[in-house]
Design a protein with these regions (language model features):
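C-terminal motif of bacterial Sec signal peptides marking the signal peptidase cleavage site
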Residues: 17-21
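Bacterial N-terminal signal peptides that target proteins for export
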Residues: 1-9
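A residue-level marker of the well-folded mature domains of exported/periplasmic proteins
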Residues: 23-360
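Intrinsically disordered, compositionally biased charged tails
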Residues: 9-10, 23
Length: 360
């Protein structure tokens, strides 16, 4: 008897379930989102940050600012990876490409260029975006970069004017500056060449010390190199080296001398002279916007002072820049933006360039 009751109950549940299923209304199409797309059309991208990862108070965090802005503005979805070593780039690029679910895969920093080119060739139907390195010969890659020399040129002009000037309390009479270079790559050399050109444009007799740190995640070595430059007489040291830059800031604090960084998130109001600004977050926002609007194209895009992407900034710093110094920097900016001054792109070009270009 119990078996019969159980059988009746099972049959009843099955029939009831079928009845409910057959009685459901036809599913309505999804409502479009605020940007005019259905949820299925929302841009989805993957991004691989540079070595050092998030929390570096520098380059990666600036990129991540753009990621968050793009997600908020366009409702974009994303996945990300934080490699701890250069050897991981290819594996992570391949992992995202294998998934086949991203509108683009974004690689951050020049160290990823070779891995990206290799993987992009193997996945011709997958779009890739390269940040800060020129790749213009692949049909599925769009590369975006700021002018590396232009990012550092105006801070170089400021440094050339500030050294030996007693209106800047942490300067000294030695007429020596320093630049801590992340790695021996075209990008890093281009950055350094901009600073050196700016300093020599404003101050032809200045001596500029340079050292290679060897990586973007080595603040200990960076501090040691910066201390050497300060001890040799430099009163201002500039750096663009991801989380390694933290070591240069520590050295500046210890020696009570000036430092110039590249992120508004990494400043020390007491010893920072300026920040060499590159609005890298705009690259991410503009890239996702092009996917959202269907205007994405492969090739190479470079932006600088003329587009408002590169500049110097003293926001949040204790330093007071005299009006006559600001006027000279403004004049230099106008000449670069207009094309009157075309900057050198590598260190071996600086001396010849400076011999022909001097501030009036």
């Amino acid at each position: 008897m119990k078996k019969n009751i159980l059988l009746y109950l099972i049959v009843f549940v099955i029939v009831a379930t079928l009845a409910v299923g057959c009685g459901q209304p036809v599913e309505e199409p999804e409502e479009p989102s605020e940007n005019g797309e259905s949820e299925e059309d929302v841009v989805k991208f993957a991004i691989i940050f540079g070595v050092g990862g998030l929390g570096d108070n520098g380059y990666n965090d600036e990129v991540n600012r753009g990621v968050k802005m793009a997600a908020e503005e366009f409702g974009a979805e994303y996945d990300y990876a934080e490699p701890q070593d250069i050897s991981e780039f290819e594996t992570q690029l391949r992992m995202f490409a294998d998934a086949g679910e991203y509108d683009t895969i974004i690689a951050v920093s020049t160290e990823q260029a070779e891995a990206l080119k290799m993987v992009a060739e193997e996945y011709p139907e997958q779009r890739f975006t390269m940040i800060d390195t020129k790749i213009d010969d692949m049909d599925n890659v769009h590369s975006i970069s700021a002018s590396h020399p232009e990012q550092h040129f105006l801070s170089g002009v400021l440094a050339g004017l500030a050294t030996q000037d007693d209106r800047f309390p942490l300067s000294n009479p030695e007429n020596i500056l320093g630049f801590a270079i992340a790695m021996d790559t075209p990008t890093s050399r281009g950055q350094a060449s901009g600073f050196l050109a700016g300093a020599k444009y404003a101050n032809p007799d200045v001596e500029i010390l340079t050292n290679y740190i060897g990586g973007y995640n080595d603040p200990v070595t960076a501090k040691e190199l910066a201390l050497v430059m300060y001890e040799r007489g430099a009163d201002i040291v500039s750096v663009n080296a991801g989380s390694s830059s933290q070591g240069v800031f520590a050295a500046a604090k210890e020696k009570n001398r000036y430092v110039i960084g590249t992120s508004l998130a990494m400043v020390d109001p007491e010893v920072s002279l300026s920040t060499s600004v590159k609005k890298v977050w705009l690259f991410i926002v503009q890239e996702i916007e092009s996917l959202d609007k269907g205007t994405w194209e492969p090739g190479f895009t470079e932006k600088g002072m003329a587009e408002g992407v590169t500049d110097y900034d003293v926001e949040g710093l204790d330093v007071e820049i005299p009006e006559d110094v600001i006027a000279k920097i403004d004049e230099a900016r106008e000449k670069v933006a207009s094309g009157e001054l075309v900057l050198p792109t590598d260190l071996d070009q600086v001396d010849a360039w400076a011999a022909e270009n001097q501030m009036e």
